[in-house]
Amino acid sequence: GGTGPVLVAGDGWSLPASPRRQHAAVVRHASRVSLPFPEPAIAVSSRAEVFLGYLDYFRSRLVSKLEALPGGELRRSRLPSGWTPIELLKHLAHDELRWLEWRFEGRPVADPWGEDRDGRWYVAPGETLEELVAALHAQAARSRAVVESHDLADMGQPGDGWDTAGPAALERVLLHLVQEYARHVGHLDIVSELADGQIGE
């Protein structure tokens, strides 16, 4: 055959593995299966779907890496800044809430900074990984609904959430969220390698 190894994505469909994907599958031996990387050559229906595809991918990588960590590592910090992996998960869900619902759509949000306490990320002792993953998935669905109901050029609603900068276009908000996820999932790659030798892409 000419297609080489095949990687199976989380919902059961498969795709031929490029050399880069084959390598990634080997080095991520400890990770749970996550969505395939949204390669630039893959056709999409719109520019908005490009952003949504990257956000879906980074969320899936985040969750698979967290689920692959030994349980004690979720609330352990391995870096001088002091954050823990489970705190990172809660932070990213709230980041989407802040940017897309509170700022862009101008919705009233009871606690837009709900992951923050005394200037640092916080997860209560009773909050579990399963609950926070479910919250992330629920937020992802709401985020997609916001994006699909607007054009990328639409401007956010005026409000206090923007500080002094003023509202931004949806496209700029999505670009910010993609870089935020990419940066933090890269941070989690480092923490995972320190915790159990799991090597990221």
Give, region by region, the residue ranges found by the protein language model:
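Ala/Thr-enriched low-complexity intrinsically disordered regions
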Residues: T3, A9, A17, A24-A25
